[in-house]
Design a protein with these regions (language model features):
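Cleavable N-terminal export/targeting peptides
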Residues: 1-42, 221
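Polar low-complexity intrinsically disordered regions enriched in Ser/Thr and small residues
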Residues: 18-19, 23, 29, 100-101, ...
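A broad, low-specificity signal for short, low-complexity segments enriched in glycine/proline
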Residues: 35-39, 50-55, 116, 151, ...
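Feature captures outer-membrane beta-barrel proteins of Gram-negative bacteria and organelles
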Residues: 37-39, 60-71, 86-104, 119-136, ...
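Transmembrane beta-strand segments that form the barrel wall of outer-membrane beta-barrel proteins
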Residues: 44-54, 64-66, 70-82, 89, ...
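Electropositive, surface-exposed helix/loop patches at the edges of structured domains
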Residues: 112-123, 172, 179-180, 208-211
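Acidic pyrophosphate-coordinating catalytic loop
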Residues: 145-149
Length: 221
């Protein structure tokens, strides 16, 4: 009988120790980042956009862009951007910060192929404060076939958004996809958004008798 009591006491003691270890391990797990934060960092986000160019005395064309982002990683593909019938593929690193003055910056490196062939360091960046937004993207194409084809591309916007779904402002562009008398084209823009869709109209060189029109549509998913 005394032997059974001894065995029973030993079992109770072991169970108590095991239970104590289980409780002690609980708070350790709560110190790790919540699964939702980790999942957010691992999520992919995508966007697709198409810009239709209506150029006086020149060929009209569509310029599509597709992006994919996951945490710091930025991937992008463009067509008819650096030149007509020319594509480019990009790899970039996302940075962001700020609260009232929020900023994003993505340095990138791309390969260009088609009518123009080369490599291109580039960037995308934005600043937003109150209802104002500044966006700019640029690249310097190093033409591996002909160094005279080296060129600096840029697209920049300064906008005001009086309400969440409406923005308007100024735009500038420097491109070789089509030729004009102006090295840097200047214009006006107005854009609308609905949920994950956006639509924007641009008028470049509005002081000319026949300005260049650009109609853009985009989607995020």
């Amino acid at each position: 009988m005394r032997a059974m009591q001894t065995v029973f006491a030993a079992l109770v003691l072991c169970a108590g120790q095991a239970f104590g270890q289980t409780i002690a391990e609980g708070p350790v797990a709560t110190n790790s980042p919540p699964p939702t934060i980790e999942n957010e960092a691992r999520k992919w986000s995508f966007s697709a956009a198409a810009m239709g160019y209506l150029v006086p005395d020149s060929r009209d064309y569509v310029q599509p862009t597709i992006t994919a982002d996951r945490g710091w990683l930025h991937l992008e593909a463009r067509y008819n951007y650096e030149n007509l019938e020319t594509g480019s593929a990009w790899l970039g690193y996302n940075f962001s910060g700020g609260n009232k003055l929020a900023w994003e910056f993505t340095p990138m490196l791309g390969g260009v192929f088609g009518h123009t062939t080369g490599i291109a360091p580039g960037y995308k960046g934005s600043l937003s404060w109150w209802k104002l937004g500044l966006y700019s993207e640029g690249e310097y194409v190093l033409d591996t076939g002909d160094s005279s084809g080296n060129f600096l591309y840029n697209w920049s916007e300064l906008t005001l958004a009086p309400v969440e779904w409406l923005r308007f402002g100024l735009v500038t562009q420097r491109t070789r996809a089509y030729q004009t008398d102006r090295d840097v084209q200047r214009g006006l823009l107005v854009g609308f958004s609905y949920k994950k869709l956006s639509f924007t109209a641009y008028v470049f060189n509005p002081d000319e008798s026949r300005p260049t029109l650009v109609l853009a549509a985009g989607m995020q998913f």
